[in-house]
């Protein structure tokens, strides 16, 4: 296995020995892991811990809306489990609803069919206050919930989730918005339902109880002709025989955090991607998988039978350095896919020899080591691919040299420096030369924004590629590719003028002509948070700030953004598209999944999962 690190200092060796001894002890041997208060703590530590617990307790810190949301979450979770099992009765409903509760039908009697093809049917409905009269009692609510779930066959694969997305504390009761999701087998295939309910609760009860529930919207997607889902989990059939999968990839990050030292780059807040390309020219796509520090990156070659072979070591690409992203692209126009890696050591370039191995051709080192995303583009139309590199946090060197401002969550401008590396071909010693032309071409404007992703596209149809950059804390950037008076490439930052600043936690970018009007549209992956949606609407949230800044924070938690390209008029955000709910959208991609000629959207989302569901 390859690593750029030189010999570890003696002090780290000693620390490693101590760590091995420590981690070999059982959990009950550890004073930090044993039940009860920690044995090794000072009075001040215990006092600080108690104060922190009080601040985290919404009831003690004055956040009554969050205290209510926490109290209502438990009965809602139980109700969701009962809905999944089916046949709700008055007894189950009485645990969460008042005896005199008011309810309406949660499933529309005549839903609107908005799509039908040989594979899927989509039904949708919105509800009006005048649609029907309220019905009284828990029996009516039980009947409404049973009717809602009537098309889903109850079984072990049935899933139901209920989450509170807004809370308003009123004297007459607590008003909430509840997001509803359910899925399972139907009569012909698989069914997925989503919806939104408006609920009023009794505030003074020890256990919150619903006094009224009214539907706001409902949608149902049903697959036809087959009991199989659209996507099948083929992990075991493809990777199951691989030792790399059994001993490495089958374990989550939480497993390795307790086994590999931080000094190797094993951290919670690392993000690792992958690259797909035909490495050996056999017409089959292969996969390069980036890994956290201390774990070898993996190259899997696809076999004719659909399985993969791990050739990482033989190919010379099993680097141990923390690697955030990779590209498989032809950099020297020889018809073979070369490898580019974004590592903590810098951007590593390896050329494909054509015999199943890779050789090092360049290592581009920056002051900033928090390198995130890579993209390849021929920005200057000279016939070879150049590289664009995004960076999240700035190094101490950059901060001192540039005198960067302090961190500002909603509009951070203290991040690392993104780089455009021009491909200048081979040098005298055989290495490939990549020249930093960031400032030269105008890409150093708004270039300290904690960038996580970037994507190139000719959005203005003028024949050259423009650049959109998604930034983690605040406004994103759109750089239009143009020419200066001398005819040289010069980018202009035009996000505000084009209407695509999109304040948020930008994590991913994808372009496609989703409405088939001849212009490329933009989809930006951000963060959706139910807790954030509740908190940012409360009067207690940032009470001394301006309304515009509060609105910015509310936007941060709304989810993803779809922008329609209206040509000379710029872009317009399409709020009614239904594409906002992507959760924590680390990656988003336009793709025509069903080959109907219309672009669909795939979103990879989530966060670290541990055995403790409360441990985020």
Explain the meaning of each model-derived region.
Residues 1-2:
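N-terminal secretory signal peptides that target proteins for export/translocation
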Residues 5-8, 14-17, 21-616:
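Acidic, glycine/proline-rich Ca2+-coordinating loop motifs
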């Amino acid at each position: 296995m390859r690593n750029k690190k030189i010999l570890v200092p003696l002090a780290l060796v000693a620390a490693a020995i101590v760590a091995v001894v420590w981690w070999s002890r059982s959990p009950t041997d550890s004073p930090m892991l044993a039940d009860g208060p920690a044995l090794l703590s000072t009075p001040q530590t215990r006092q600080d811990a108690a104060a922190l617990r009080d601040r985290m307790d919404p009831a003690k810190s004055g956040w009554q809306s969050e205290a209510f949301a926490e109290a209502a979450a438990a009965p809602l979770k139980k109700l969701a489990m009962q809905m999944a099992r089916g046949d709700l009765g008055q007894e189950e409903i009485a645990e969460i609803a008042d005896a005199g509760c008011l309810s309406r039908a949660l499933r529309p009697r005549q839903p609107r069919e908005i799509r039908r093809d040989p594979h899927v049917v989509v039904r949708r409905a919105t509800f009006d206050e005048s649609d029907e009269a309220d019905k009284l009692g828990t029996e009516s609510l039980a009947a409404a919930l049973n009717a809602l779930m009537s098309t889903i066959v109850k079984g072990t694969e049935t899933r139901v989730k209920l989450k509170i997305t807004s809370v308003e504390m009123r004297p007459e009761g607590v008003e909430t918005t509840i997001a509803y999701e359910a899925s399972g087998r139907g009569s012909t295939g698989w069914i997925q339902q989503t919806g939104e309910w408006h609920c009023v609760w009794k505030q003074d009860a020890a256990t919150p109880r619903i006094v009224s529930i009214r539907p706001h919207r409902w949608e149902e997607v049903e697959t036809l002709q087959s009991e199989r889902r659209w996507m099948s989990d083929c992990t075991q059939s493809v990777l199951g025989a691989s030792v790399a999968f059994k001993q490495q990839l089958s374990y989550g990050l939480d497993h390795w955090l307790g086994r590999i030292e931080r000094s190797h780059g094993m951290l919670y807040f690392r993000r690792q991607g992958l690259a797909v390309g035909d490495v050996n020219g056999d017409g089959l796509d292969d996969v390069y998988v980036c890994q956290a520090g201390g774990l070898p990156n993996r190259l899997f070659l696809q076999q004719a039978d659909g399985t993969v072979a791990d050739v990482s070591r033989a190919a010379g690409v099993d680097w141990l350095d923390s690697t955030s992203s990779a590209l498989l692209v032809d950099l020297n126009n020889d018809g073979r896919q070369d490898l580019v890696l974004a590592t903590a050591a810098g951007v590593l370039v390896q050329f494909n020899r054509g015999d199943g191995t890779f050789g090092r051709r360049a290592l581009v080192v920056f002051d900033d080591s928090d390198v995130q995303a890579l993209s390849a583009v021929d920005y200057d139309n000279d016939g070879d691919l150049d590289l664009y590199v995004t960076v999240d946090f700035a190094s101490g060197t950059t901060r001192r040299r540039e005198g960067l401002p302090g961190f500002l969550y909603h509009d951070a401008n203290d991040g690392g420096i993104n780089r455009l590396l021009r491909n200048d071909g081979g040098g005298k010693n055989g290495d490939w030369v990549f020249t930093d032309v960031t400032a030269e071409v105008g890409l150093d404007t708004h270039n300290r924004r904690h960038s996580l992703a970037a994507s190139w596209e000719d959005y203005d149809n003028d024949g050259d590629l423009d650049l959109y950059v998604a930034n983690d804390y605040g406004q994103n950037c759109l750089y239009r590719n143009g020419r200066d008076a001398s005819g040289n490439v010069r980018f202009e930052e035009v996000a505000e003028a084009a209407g695509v600043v999109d304040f948020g936690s930008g994590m991913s970018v994808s372009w496609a002509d989703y409405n088939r009007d001849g212009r490329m549209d933009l989809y930006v992956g951000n963060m959706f948070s139910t807790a954030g949606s509740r908190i940012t609407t409360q009067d207690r949230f940032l009470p001394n700030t301006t309304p515009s800044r509060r609105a910015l924070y509310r936007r941060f938690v709304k989810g993803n953004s779809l922008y329609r390209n209206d040509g000379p008029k710029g872009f317009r955000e399409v709020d009614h598209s239904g594409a906002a709910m992507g959760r924590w959208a680390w990656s988003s991609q336009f793709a025509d999944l069903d080959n109907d000629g219309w672009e669909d959207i795939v979103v990879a989302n989530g966060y670290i999962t541990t055995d403790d569901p409360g441990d985020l």
